[in-house]
Amino acid sequence: MKKILLIFIGFLIMSCDDYLDIVPDKTQELSLLFERKEAAYTALVTCYSYMPQNDGIYSTYVLASDELTTPFAKDTPAIELMKGEQNADNPIMGYWSGYSALGRGQESLFKGIRACNTLIQNIDNVLDMTPEEKLNWKSEAIFLKAYYHFLLLIHYGPIPIVDVNLPISSSVDDVKVRRELVDDVFQYIFNTVDLSIDGLIERNLTTNSFGRIDKVIAKSFKSRVSIYYASPMFNGNTEIFSSFTNENGEHYFNQIYDETKWNLAAEYTSEAIQACLDNGLSLYEYNGQPAAYDYTSYSNSNFIQKLYDLRYLIRDKWNSELIWGNSKPVGSNDEWWNLQAGALMKDPSASRVEAAWQWVAPTMRMAELYYTKNGLPIDEDIQFNFNNRYSTTYVGSNQMEEAQRGQQTAILNLNREPRFYSNIGFDRGFYRGWGELWRLRMKKGESHGRIANSSDYLTTGYSLKKIVHPDSEGDSYGKLVDYPWPLIRLAELYLSYAEALNEISGPSQEVFDAINKVRARAGIPMIDEIWSNPSFAKTPGKHTSRDGLREIIHQERMIELAFEGHRYYDLRRWLKAHEYFNTPVFGWSVDESERDSYYQKILVGQRTFLKERDYLHPIKTTELTRNSNLIQNPNW
């Protein structure tokens, strides 16, 4: 049996060069590899193993947008991507052919699809499984096949549809696949997810099943697919892809905007939300004990309670809001691969800081993105001192939960919403980490600032709290607290529902209600309340027009889902990426030790994103050589 398993695993995990050769291995009796449940389970695990790891510092697309930056010496593949170093000869972070970085990377997702097809086509041969087990495992593989097609679609646009592994007798022409029209790929994904749903269990909540696909996950994923399907990049995209056609002259991207796609998105998202509610999911609220340093303030302060809700939101394992999480995170033992270690600040009093690198930093753009305490953008709040936001001021007694009373910090860092303080650290602010409450001192030479010319430093002067577990300690990798990376959570569905409804018929109470659920948990005023108040809003009534509300919804989404891997994809599907990703990166002057010199907005990096090229990733040149039926993406 052991020999069979080894052969089987070797069959599934082929070299990258063979990934889209969808002819099975030379082993004629493939069905023999599926005689026992043990082998079938190995096949299922292999199907899951191709899921990208967004908590890996060299594999995450979180770093590919304008959310985060690193010192030059710490460039990751995603940072290289956004600096304009992408190429077709050896694509950076390529899901089509796979890639490697520091000995790790991502295997081709076409290999993952092939692994799924292998299980789907053979699991019925297993002798020691019940029909119900076979159907459930097969349905999981069917879903994962749809998921991998979707990931390829949103990176490359038109892709080949690989629904089955071809027989060994297939001709050379049969295996030279072609790219399909984008709408056809979407329909295939919808149909494949639907095919999976009937055979899935309602909800996987047993300890050894966390992260495995169930009906709630499938319906929620279908919501996400439908939102992309309706969005400008994929719906009537004449702006960028008007000349991108196949050999028959057919446009790969449809050229006529179809508003009914938003109806589909609203329908699928409503169904997903109801499935979540029927299965007991809800927006997360912290129900544990506060840390000793917060014990008194927690019981007396709604602000501190909100910080706990938001700080543990994605870190409290398998909580009530998490619909789907990656059950195989990078982990504390993966050392140079761990994104949490890259963001974790160093303890200046620790004798070792092995797993606290302190060089993954939020950009100033992200610091400016979050709302004021009134729930308005900083440039829309009459009561916020927007024009002088880069100047410093003393922290008053009414701001002592936001920053250190009596200290001076930037006006930008004060009077902001709880999500800002939960997600981002700053000079003279607070940091809950290493099991302690730190009072941050971030100027050069200070306890949390850059030390001499070390390459471990926060280039913008901001630290990333959101992905760091408060109990993680950086003196060893074993002390990092692992958690499942959130792939889908309930807040996303509420915001997707609001987005779809607004695109269909404009503002309504139903749209406001969906957004307000997320805002209430964030501790900020309701959208229809604050945007109607001329004492606060510079543009009162902005929420009453479709265009105005669209802008509000987009910002709400970018705040709520910040640093989770959505921004790179959302800005592309909205066709806004070329506006955001082709701009400089700014931060504070972190090499300065004096206050007035430190609080200067300076250039810390440059991004490059070409509108006519970078919305799609390149197919590796060697793939085009091997398969003459493949057409390269525009301008690559």
Q: Where on the chain are the PLM-derived regions?
A:
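Conserved, well-structured interaction surfaces
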Residues: 38-55, 59, 77-156, 172-215, ...
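Short coil/linker segments at helix-helix boundaries
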Residues: 159-179, 233-264
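Flexible, polar/acidic helix-loop-strand segments at domain edges
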Residues: 92, 332, 341, 350-489
